[in-house]
Amino acid sequence: LFKGTDKIGTVDYAKEKPWLDSIAAKYDILAETKDANKRNIIQKDINRLSIKAGEYAIPNEFSSLITSFGGTGLNAFTSFDETVFHNSFSPQYIHQWCELNSERLMSPVFRLFQGELETVYEEKNMYSDNMLMQPAEDAESKIFAGTPYAYSIIGSTENLKNPRLGEMKEFYNKYYVANNMTLILTGDVNADSISNILENTFGRIRSGKVEKEQPFNLKPLKDLATMKLKLPIPIVKAGGIVYRAPIDRDSDYNAFTVALGLLNNSSETGLLDSLRNDNKVMYAIAMMSPFKETNVVGVGFVPNIPFGSRKKAERMCVEQIEKLKKGDFSDDFLNSTKLLLEKDAQENLENIDNRANIMTTAASHGLSWKNVLDKGKDIAAVSRE
């Protein structure tokens, strides 16, 4: 949604639209065509139509308008649970910012699509260059089999070869409705003073029927076979163990957060940290993937190189996890870890970018702001029991 609307990003939308409609129709035909020669002819036709449509486009006009009103960092990202459009701006331009962004969401036009598709290809190639990306996606496809989390966010090469602008528009019409979106503002904002501005701008966005999310059941990890993933790193060996974990709406999530902090933390005083600090392994870490509907914690380890044993490294990590399960740690260690986690939670709220991310996750996952503010207190209340 960066290419403008029927009012932004075009010199004459009435003349541009027939060309855009023709391009959309051609992409839908391309997706149905398997013959390489026929595909080549269609792609050349798309290129010809795109050149004609481009005569009416004003590239980056939306971005330029945002910048002219003090906006910076205009960007977006898609995760497994949400798509987020974001930027910073000067508060004195709140009215202009609301006008532009509400207009953007009300009537987007998917122009300059050919160039945008090339950008997505470049992004996918960039991910492919990350040697850990493919093993991670392979693991996720097994761990989250049968759920949307099993699929790559950016899609497969086959998906990108056969885009359908018609399906994109259907997706927009279905999901980009007021009751399926959240507006998040953080910084120098007085909610009472801007409520009328918000109502007169974002209040124009249509509502729609939002399907209730269906719960899904994941297979117990013990029923999954051991996976062997090849990392393209000479000499270095690595391994990992994955556990199911509570989600952030569960009553035991804060206790789990403390348990994870006892394994490793920002001060590197955890039970797994000690393995690395004592040079018993090259690397050991426990990290969670807190999705909205499920959560897993992965314990990753790298034995010392060049002759360290992967089995021995795994055994030492499991021993540290067993210590945690048995409560084989001091009260001082527990209390200092809780204090560290409380401090981290508070400091995250003091940084505007971190706070925006926390607010986004809370809104997406159905958490109240009170849940967020009480996190430090809830962590402090966690006991050994």
PLM features: residue spans?
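M16 family metallopeptidases and their MPP-like homologs
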Residues: L1-E103, Q134-E158, N180-T186, V236-I247, ...
